[in-house]
Amino acid sequence: MDNEFLTRKDLSLKAKGLLACMLCLPPDWRFSIEGLAYINKESESAISSALRELEQFDYLRRSYPRTEDGKIANAVYTICDIPIVEYEALHGESDDALN
């Protein structure tokens, strides 16, 4: 894990801690606000605000695929220890190596 994000002054401690936690979870872990709140002993509201901040700074992207019958499925989280746009510039635009 690159620690550049831990030294950013424009990123809150809450967002830094949540990102560090998310990066340490197994690759097959199913991210959800409820699950992150449970393992971090934080409210779902606190987790939601930290996730929004991580999205704002491009460490997190959430997509909402649709099921075959058109319903919105669970969110798919893409996370990275550097802003995703920087990762894509270095490695191409494939999300394959991202969590």
List the predicted regions and their residue ranges.
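Winged helix-turn-helix DNA-binding recognition segment
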Residues: 5-17, 22-77
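Long, low-complexity, charged/polar intrinsically disordered regions in eukaryotic proteins
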Residues: 1-3
